[in-house]
Amino acid sequence: MRVNNGLTPQELEAYGISDVHDIVYNPSYDLLYQEELDPSLTGYERGVLTNLGAVAVDTGIFTGRSPKDKYIVRDDTTRDTFWWADKGKGKNDNKPLSPETWQHLKGLVTKQLSGKRLFVVDAFCGANPDTRLSVRFITEVAWQAHFVKNMFIRPSDEELAGFKPDFIVMNGAKCTNPQWKEQGLNSENFVAFNLTERMQLIGGTWYGGEMKKGMFSMMNYLLPLKGIASMHCSANVGEKGDVAVFFGLSGTGKTTLSTDPKRRLIGDDEHGWDDDGVFNFEGGCYAKTIKLSKEAEPEIYNAIRRDALLENVTVREDGSIDFDDGSKTENTRVSYPIYHIENIVKPVSKAGHATKVIFLTADAFGVLPPVSRLTADQTQYHFLSGFTAKLAGTERGITEPTPTFSACFGAAFLSLHPTQYAEVLVKRMQAAGAQAYLVNTGWNGTGKRISIKDTRAIIDAILNGSLDNAETFTLPMFNLAIPTELPGVDTKILDPRNTYASPEQWQEKAETLAKLFIDNFDKYTDTPAGAALVAAGPKL
């Protein structure tokens, strides 16, 4: 067994963890496999072996992130820079926490981890050595260590020898905070950050995504302050080195559409864009598996094998997986190391500057076209609007599609004001001569979801330039430029009005959606730059 590799219990004592029985340091996949399937494990610690070779775990009631339980310590480091939930017009999840309450939460987590056998995983967040975070994850649960090993960048032995953590994540999933009411918190569960101590604490929730998205929120704080774009997007690169980025909220198609046999994958969810180009923050993928089929998404299906980790899927007695069963959650997931996808950028997940920027939206109203080409002002408007329908299950309590606006297609993970991300992105796009497009992967007037086949043909037309050469017409009210025809796409669906029994039906729904856009964008009109963008949005 690879135990501690030079990491001593004394080092953990510096974080407040005492009486450590032993440290399993950067465990191998083989060791994690044995640990997860240990028959003596009970509850959510226990893994189940599936017939695809991957282990499956359950995360209990926490089958998605808990944004209402997210807190950031408000102190001299963050007071004037963070985008706070209790200031300004914008709504977000960055609730302030006092240094005193932080110390109490830290005491709960360190008490939980003390006197235990611990898994410690050292990993990088960010493929660019100049700006990456060296993160140390500490947990008592084997599969949580496995999740981290899948999702973050795995250091070489040489890099581990000189590893000095910039950030510590202590996962105390088994502990809760009984004093939450007196402290004015949302519940007994917590996901808390301290930028001065450079630490994240997790209590009460078993959901693996809290570690992944926690570090994304930190990159979203640190990078834009250096002029580097930090983006909730997937990215891939073509044979000629042409890079495309796909922005979108969970479930809109980021992973599916960027995993393309004709292009090499840079990453599926979190990226930076600096003077050298686009780079991945992660070393793995976290794909939704609800209704997954080998026929529709072969690359993702084939990635589910030994070393992949499934979450909240239904495993039958014979070890087979029912991917259609959403009874635990619609947000069933699999994490796997990025090299489980054959067609990836090697050896480092980065490439040149992006020339195509694609905003993915899933419109539950059936109003927006499957694709439109955006002007420079429309690019900023739709980036700041971040419209989609929240799809079932990516957060607790949401089971039906409901319209939502999420600034920069990732408001839940923003640490600075949205306009700061828009400014950095626009500068990067202008320097690279990039063009933006709005792609609707949602529903049309028939009530049917636009097919993956049609959406893939649309993406192909964007990437090969044929969309830029196509004739366009303007969709009224939203003033969006829509191609009259595209190769491989049913022409009838390009104009959303054609999918309704009458144009009046579209008009009625369009007015409802336009009003939602206008009302949402009002929060940006308190600055001259924001007010100037109103004209790029829908008009009633």
Swiss-Prot record:
Query: Which residues are the signal sequence here?
Result: none
Task: State its cofactor.
Answer: Mn(2+)
Q: What does the record say about how the cofactor binds? A: Binds 1 Mn(2+) ion per subunit.
Catalysed reaction per UniProt?
Answer: oxaloacetate + ATP = phosphoenolpyruvate + ADP + CO2
Q: In which pathway does it act?
A: Carbohydrate biosynthesis; gluconeogenesis
Q: Where are the transmembrane segments?
A: none
Q: Which NCBIfam families match?
A: pckA, PRK09344.1-1, PRK09344.1-2, PRK09344.1-3
Indicate what this protein is called per its UniProt record.
Phosphoenolpyruvate carboxykinase (ATP)
Species in which this protein is naturally found: Escherichia coli (strain SMS-3-5 / SECEC)
